[in-house]
Regions:
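Conserved class I S-adenosyl-L-methionine
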Residues: 1-39, 147
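Class I SAM-dependent methyltransferase SAM/SAH-binding core
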Residues: 43-45, 52-97
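A short acidic, Gly/Pro-enriched loop at the edge of an enzyme's catalytic core
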Residues: 99-108
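Short "lid" loop at the C-terminus of a central beta-strand within the Rossmann-like core
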Residues: 116, 143-149, 184-185
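A short, conserved alpha-helix within the catalytic core of class I
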Residues: 116-129
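Conserved beta-strand signature within the Rossmann-like core of class I S-adenosyl-L-methionine
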Residues: 136-143
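Acceptor-substrate binding/catalytic loop of class I
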Residues: 150-167, 191-195, 199
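Short alpha-helix
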Residues: 160-180
Length: 208
């Protein structure tokens, strides 16, 4: 059985611990690229945001952040992290299919390790993320590549959920690719993303 077939139950079980399983610190790739390409006051959507580490960091930079996740426990922990950090984030309980994807809504969409999606769902999700960006809006994404199956230091063990350069180029066709990097790096993001990792990072800008 695919562990993602009941996503809410799967993620509620994973998040059912006092610890922040991916840590409280924002993803390194996001911090680097947001500093370069996002401005204070930008409207940002964080997709499948989990326990809030990325949305809270963006709010600390002065951005207006909406974030959703399908796990009630993740939302509760994210709200607490925002409260502890003295920032405001608009958290909503939703899946990637039930979220209200309004067109031309955001200056940026942030998608960090959203590899719960099989190829069919992934194509649908990327189309929605691009649609909800304003013209000249920026998509910042990080995920694992197939080599991650050798490292086993985080992410799904399902090959078709992982990213390649070619897959991502096809999915963001029509956008201007600012950065598309495939690389290896030691991660230290809580207990679930720890050790040498095979990564892909993307920054792309909507043209229309």
């Amino acid at each position: 059985m695919d562990v993602f077939s009941d996503g809410a139950e799967f993620w509620n079980q994973r998040f059912n611990t006092p610890d922040y399983i991916f840590g409280r610190t924002a993803n390194d790739y996001l911090r680097e690229k947001a500093t370069l390409y996002l401005a204070e006051g930008s409207t940002v959507l964080c997709v499948a945001d989990g326990e809030g580490r990325n949305s809270v960091w963006l709010a600390k930079q002065g951005m207006q952040v909406d974030a959703f996740d399908l796990s009630t426990l993740a939302i509760t922990k994210a709200k607490q992290l925002a409260l502890d950090s003295e920032v405001q984030v608009n958290y909503l309980l939703a899946s990637s299919d039930s979220w209200d994807w309004r067109p031309n809504q955001y200056d940026a969409v942030v998608a960090i390790f959203i590899q719960f999606a099989d190829p069919t769902m992934r194509a649908r999700l990327f189309a929605k993320m691009m649609s909800t960006l304003k013209p000249r809006g920026v998509l910042i994404l990080q995920g694992y590549t197939p080599k991650q199956l050798e490292y086993k230091t985080g992410g799904p063990s399902i090959l078709e959920h992982l990213y390649t350069d070619g897959i991502i180029r096809d999915l963001v066709g029509g956008m201007d690719i600012i950065d598309l990097s495939v690389y290896e790096k030691v991660l230290s993001e809580g207990s679930k993303h720890t050790g040498m990792s095979a990564l892909l990072g993307l920054v792309a800008r909507k043209t229309l």
